[in-house]
Amino acid sequence: MYYSSLAEAFERLERISSRKAKISLIAQFLRQCPEDVVDTVALFLANQVFPGWDPRDLGIGSKLMRKVIATATGSTDSEVTELFKRLGDLGLTAEELLKRRKTSTLLDSRPLMVGEVRETFEKIAEVEGEGAVKRKMRLMMGLLARAKPKEARYLVRQALSELRTGVRESTVEEAIAQAFGVSRKLVERAHMLSNDLGLVAKVAMTKGEEGLREIDLRPMRPIKPMLAQAARNVKEALAEVGGKGAVEIKLDGARVQVHSDGEEVRVYTRRIEDVTHALPDIVEAVKDCVDADEFILEGEAVAINPETGKPRPFQELLHRIKRKYDIEEVRKEIPVELHLFDCLYVDGESLVDTPFRERRRRLEEIVREREGEVMLVEQVITDDPKEAAEMFHRALEMGHEGVMVKDLDANYTPGVRGKKMLKVKPVLETLDCVVIGGIWGKGKRKGLIGSYLLAVWDENKENLLEVGKVGTGMDDETLERLTKMFEDLIVEESGREVRFKPEVVFEVEFEDIQKSPKYSSGFALRFPRLVRVRDDLGPEDADTIEKVRRIYEEVLQKH
């Protein structure tokens, strides 16, 4: 398939505002796709280069892309920067500069194919080591050298994961169902269990509903975690799960999925980052302590202070997880324990449709606990709010966040936030917000992004809604660190205002929530303060407007 056909589809999607019309267009396009590229096309339409389970990324930010565009179009860096500031989009910048280019005789005239683009993106993602930046640039420039202006717009946007077509995974799910006449629920389930929208599209096309039913969990193909809703107290949480539930300590660590295919063990974060190399102690302990060949287990990696027995600050754990060099040295400095709480797959058997009580039993059967290395999360099964409250207070005394209350009969629903699992924490809830923009500072803060625009998802997780700006309470050192982080995510610039690729999540606390027409959500956070950057969360994990409304109602009642 010619990439130009896909670029035309992207452009049409960009112009359409109706979700129903987008679904219809995508369905029609997928039906016309050759079988050998339908998986790639489905991923590309969903603004993905790789399946959700695949932790690879291209490693190309906006700074590097500006250099690529300059070289590929024979422009200067300043020409690219000025045009980008005017257009607010590097894709449009590349398109405009290619239209101006007069050296067409030097270009490779072969048309770009969708399969070639996918292969080149794979090569870019695999480049590492000395000279990696230059090699990534060369590969990306190779695509742009053969691209027509419109193709360049979308190649650049794809590489930056910023397609701007208003299409999300759920949109493509519906389109797959419509295109191939299969059940939407089967498509959703197959996607949940495979974390691979491309695979789902190909199976729907070639094997229909029968093939979709066969898609299941597989070790080394990590899935999105099941998510918890918040409850105000343990009494409310127990009531939500039917009066009796499993109460577990909510550890202050990083949620991980541990996979074994019988030959090797790998560890993934909730954002599907492969952190196996950084946690050799967990890998070794799991090999010794789990009596099964193939498995998928869930747990919390916790950095413990050996002197106090209490958890170290979360940022220290992140330092350990993100470390790429001198692993043995940092392993001694920051020892990590694995506390397991769920079992999703054992030796060929998927357990996602099994009640939680049975999954916990299987976990207890296969795990031999070893103090300080691999343990089961402490649990009590109770219908007594007083007993649950005692567990809650003990968790806080131990330095942890609170408790989880789980429905004993609940199956496991990947990527879904529901009331089958609830979290109870001691203070006014914080919000996990996607950072979508910022403002360059003035005076002493010139050269630093001084405030950040926060957003949450709408009910359908289709659009981001603004809820306020955070800037107070951050010293210059923090602002320097954040500015460095966000500079490469700038996708639009107008005066002092910038817009970011929605990738980073801030956890913020605040004094109050008020109704306000100032922001697109209709609400404004009063005196928000940054608690931490949630490196363990992706933008899709941020909170929704429903949580904002609930907190607003609770605040109203207190007033």
From Swiss-Prot:
Protein residues bound to ATP: 248, 255, 270, 300, 341, 417, 423
Task: Output the InterPro entries linked to this UniProt entry.
Answer: ATP-dep_DNA_ligase, DNA_ligae_ATP-dep_bac/arc, DNA_ligase_ATP-dep, DNA_ligase_ATP-dep_C, DNA_ligase_ATP-dep_cent, DNA_ligase_ATP-dep_CS, DNA_ligase_ATP-dep_N, DNA_ligase_N_sf
Coiled-coil positions: none
Keywords attached to this Swiss-Prot or TrEMBL record, sorted alphabetically, are: ATP-binding, Cell cycle, Cell division, DNA damage, DNA recombination, DNA repair, DNA replication, Ligase, Magnesium, Metal-binding, Nucleotide-binding
UniProt cross-references to PROSITE patterns, sorted A to Z: DNA_LIGASE_A1 (PS00697), DNA_LIGASE_A2 (PS00333), DNA_LIGASE_A3 (PS50160)
The reaction(s) annotated as catalysed by this protein in its Swiss-Prot or TrEMBL entry are: ATP + (deoxyribonucleotide)n-3'-hydroxyl + 5'-phospho-(deoxyribonucleotide)m = (deoxyribonucleotide)n+m + AMP + diphosphate
User: Its Enzyme Commission number?
Assistant: 6.5.1.1
User: What highest taxon heads this organism's lineage?
Assistant: Archaea
UniProt record, GO biological process = cell division; DNA biosynthetic process; DNA recombination; DNA repair; lagging strand elongation
Q: Which GO terms describe its molecular function?
A: ATP binding; DNA binding; DNA ligase (ATP) activity; metal ion binding
Cofactor(s) the protein requires to work:
Mg(2+)
- Please list the residues that make up the active site: 250
Job of this protein = DNA ligase that seals nicks in double-stranded DNA during DNA replication, DNA recombination and DNA repair.
Family membership, please give it. Answer: Belongs to the ATP-dependent DNA ligase family.
Report what the protein is called.
Answer: DNA ligase
| Organism, as annotated | Methanopyrus kandleri (strain AV19 / DSM 6324 / JCM 9639 / NBRC 100938)
